Amino acid sequence: MALKEGLRAWKRIFWRQILLTLGLLGLFLYGLPKFRHLEALIPMGVCPSATMSQLRDNFTGALRPWARPEVLTCTPWGAPIIWDGSFDPDVAKQEARQQNLTIGLTIFAVGRYLEKYLERFLETAEQHFMAGQSVMYYVFTELPGAVPRVALGPGRRLPVERVARERRWQDVSMARMRTLHAALGGLPGREAHFMFCMDVDQHFSGTFGPEALAESVAQLHSWHYHWPSWLLPFERDAHSAAAMAWGQGDFYNHAAVFGGSVAALRGLTAHCAGGLDWDRARGLEARWHDESHLNKFFWLHKPAKVLSPEFCWSPDIGPRAEIRRPRLLWAPKGYRLLRN
């Protein structure tokens, strides 16, 4: 096993060097889109055998990382990375029912995002999100009367919270953390045991069940999960509260999906809202806004579980052998219309 892990490590280094050379050439000759297809050649690494045998989860029981040898199934700090085939979904469902959990899902639908995305998001969530569980959909919008009526199953409710309309789309994104922190300290935080926060411009395409639950949950970004850490788009402006020095950072996480217990998310949203306020007071704005601060938080406070890109996939990337069953799919963006 040690020899196998060593060979995988050398293979990973070799392919990174090849990719870098081909990538630089590709950038000059063909442009960036051609380069994207080469990154799938980089091996993701292998979970050490000592860690692999110890991977367990409160909802899925013993995990099966050996069922996915082609992908990385654990983090350096011993948290599982959840891939299709690495867990028993029936065990997770049974455990969640025994605990009689209520799971919250927050969605911000502001401006044209409401009319373009919200209805499909909610309809597909009813098919795939925590099926058979008690669920609270918390929709935050400046137009509560425009929220579509969606047929909900037993034990599932859809409270709507009014929020102020922000002037810029960047401010909408960044105000989310402050609003979530307040909500988690109020009624939503008392109603739900676990909470997920998701972007509305995506839709469910497969089962998103209790296997995703943990004290704190991060989502690998589908555009960056093959990249070495030094190429990841962390905030590098040393003056920003989200700044991460070169050499810091392990995975790049997507702010379109994150979750955890109410207490853990209170800490996460307090950190991100505080960092955003710090930057604003100094006339700064992190490159990727609240996502930059989210990644800084998960660097300082490691998540208990990481979801593979299968749980939030971009169809623009195209098919990948390791992406067996996408759970969420990004919707076409149309930023020029939506953000005007």
UniProtKB/Swiss-Prot annotation:
Xref: Gene3D superfamilies: Spore Coat Polysaccharide Biosynthesis Protein SpsA, Chain A
This protein's UniProt keywords: Glycoprotein, Glycosyltransferase, Golgi apparatus, Lipid metabolism, Manganese, Membrane, Metal-binding, Signal-anchor, Transferase, Transmembrane, Transmembrane helix
Organism: Homo sapiens
Transmembrane segments annotated in the record for this chain: 13-32
Pfam family, one: Glyco_transf_6
GO BP annotations, alphabetical order: carbohydrate metabolic process; glycosphingolipid biosynthetic process; lipid glycosylation
Tissue specificity of this protein: Expressed in thymus and monocyte derived dendritic cells.
Protein name as it appears in the record: Alpha-1,3-galactosyltransferase 2
Gene Ontology cellular-component terms listed: Golgi apparatus; Golgi cisterna membrane; vesicle
Catalytic reaction annotation: a beta-D-galactosyl-(1->4)-N-acetyl-beta-D-glucosaminyl derivative + UDP-alpha-D-galactose = an alpha-D-galactosyl-(1->3)-beta-D-galactosyl-(1->4)-N-acetyl-beta-D-glucosaminyl derivative + UDP + H(+); a beta-D-Gal-(1->4)-beta-D-Glc-(1<->1)-Cer(d18:1(4E)) + UDP-alpha-D-galactose = an isogloboside iGb3Cer (d18:1(4E)) + UDP + H(+); a globoside Gb3Cer + UDP-alpha-D-galactose = a globoside GalGb3Cer + UDP + H(+)
UniProt-annotated glycosylation sites, renumbered to this chain: N58, N100
Residues exposed to the Cytoplasmic side: 1-12
Coiled-coil annotated residue ranges, if any: none
GO molecular function per UniProt: glycosyltransferase activity; metal ion binding; N-acetyllactosaminide 3-alpha-galactosyltransferase activity
Residues that bind Mn(2+): D199, D201
SUPFAM superfamilies on file: Nucleotide-diphospho-sugar transferases
Compartment annotation: Golgi apparatus, Golgi stack membrane
Family classification: Belongs to the glycosyltransferase 6 family.
Function, as annotated: Synthesizes the galactose-alpha(1,3)-galactose group on the glycosphingolipid isoglobotrihexosylceramide or isogloboside 3 (iGb3) by catalyzing the transfer of galactose from UDP-Galactose to its acceptor molecule Gal-beta-1,4-Glc-ceramide. Can also catalyze the addition of galactose to iGb3 itself to form polygalactose structures.
Lumenal side, ranges: 33-340
Topology versus the membrane: Single-pass type II membrane protein
Lineage of producing organism: Eukaryota, Metazoa, Chordata, Craniata, Vertebrata
